[in-house]
Amino acid sequence: MKPVTLYDVAEYAGVSYQTVSRVVNQASHVSAKTREKVEAAMAELNYIPNRVAQQLAGKQSLLIGVATSSLALHAPSQIVAAIKSRADQLGASVVVSMVERSGVEACKAAVHNLLAQRVSGLIINYPLDDQDAIAVEAACTNVPALFLDVSDQTPINSIIFSHEDGTRLGVEHLVALGHQQIALLAGPLSSVSARLRLAGWHKYLTRNQIQPIAEREGDWSAMSGFQQTMQMLNEGIVPTAMLVANDQMALGAMRAITESGLRVGADISVVGYDDTEDSSCYIPPLTTIKQDFRLLGQTSVDRLLQLSQGQAVKGNQLLPVSLVKRKTTLAPNTQTASPRALADSLMQLARQVSRLESGQ
């Protein structure tokens, strides 16, 4: 179907092309009656303004560019959705460029793509070390930029959740339940967020005189959580609890626990990180560290608008996190396993012994 043009709107409303253009670009010298007539025609014809063309014409509406990690991951997709929701409330538009490869050069390429579309400001949700973040900020030229996945020590404009509080809450929850045999499942250590969470866990476990019995590294995906946890269990390492760096990997870990004949919560407690929308629907529902992505989206758009107007205080802004207690964490050894669960566990042990005897 042929897209509706300004000429179509002008003909339908009985006005000139120039008049429709002035209405679309919110020019002041148009009568209220004429504006209403043109807007009614636009609504009737379902006319969609060309935002890039409006920018080229000098219209001062805000066009926000978002450079983001893969939207196949739950957290980045929810953050982008929250940014779009807030931008829509303010009458702004959003254009997204996904960073397809790893590394600072790929992030710069995404930024250059957005700058070519004449964005008014940039939100960068991609993990960057301090020097890389500074280099990306320099590539933004004179366009204000806000970073969402950097260290709170990076000397740039950023909004991040408190990794310190998030890791402390997870450790304190398990310690309060009585856990001592705790395994860690980190995200990819190329990610600053993954490293900060791992460091935080170590800090607060050490304060409680606990050494993790195992450390594994995933890639944020559920499959990596499954594979890393299954490998750990097959090696005979069975913790009473796991701290996992995001909810998707926690889902995979829960599958591995269940397929190994163990029970999530009763045998191995699991604490996730993020509180993505699906976490309450896991079986059992996941105990996790909540990062409020809706709040992050709203705050980042508001602050970027302030930065573009020279009003915002520059520097780092920390957002709060909280512990959401659900059904995947229990005190260790508080429930008696069912005969079926015991049988499954014995079969798993027999398989492990058989592999050892055969030299596999």
Curated annotation (Swiss-Prot):
S-S pairs: none
InterPro entries: HTH_LacI, LacI/GalR-like_sensor, Lambda_DNA-bd_dom_sf, Peripla_BP_I
GO CC field: cytosol
Gene Ontology biological-process entries: negative regulation of DNA-templated transcription; regulation of DNA-templated transcription
Domain HTH lacI-type: 1-58
UniProt keyword annotations, A-Z: DNA-binding, Repressor, Transcription, Transcription regulation
Molecular function, one GO term: transcription cis-regulatory region binding
CDD domains: HTH_LacI (cd01392), PBP1_repressor_sugar_binding-like (cd01537)
Residue ranges of DNA binding: 6-25
Source superkingdom: Bacteria
Effect of residue 22 to N: Recognizes an operator variant
Protein task: Repressor of the lactose operon. Binds allolactose as an inducer.
Quaternary context: Homotetramer.
Miscellaneous comment in the UniProt entry for this protein: Removing residues 1-59 results in loss of DNA-binding activity but retains tetrameric structure and inducer-binding activity. Deleting residues 340-360 results in loss of tetramer formation, but retains dimer formation, inducer-binding activity, and DNA-binding activity (if residues 1-59 are present).
Protein's name according to its UniProt entry: Lactose operon repressor
Organism: Escherichia coli (strain K12)
High-level lineage: Bacteria, Pseudomonadati, Pseudomonadota, Gammaproteobacteria, Enterobacterales
